[in-house]
Amino acid sequence: MTFINNDAYSTLGINSFDISKKFISKILIIVINKNTILRYLWSVSEYSVHPRIFYQSLFHQ
């Protein structure tokens, strides 16, 4: 019984460690790419404004 319990506990520990490792890697990726993500959001907000100006300039000409 103890062997089975230890085996189940070890697999549980490995699974939780893998989950925490993935979570930590996601946090690290977010922290590393925070500037890139902010630039992406800024460019998306710019591009959401620019087509209106572009279409207005097309129609007004």
UniProtKB/Swiss-Prot annotation:
Designated name of the protein: Uncharacterized 7.2 kDa protein
Task: Say which species the protein is native to.
Answer: Vaccinia virus (strain Copenhagen)
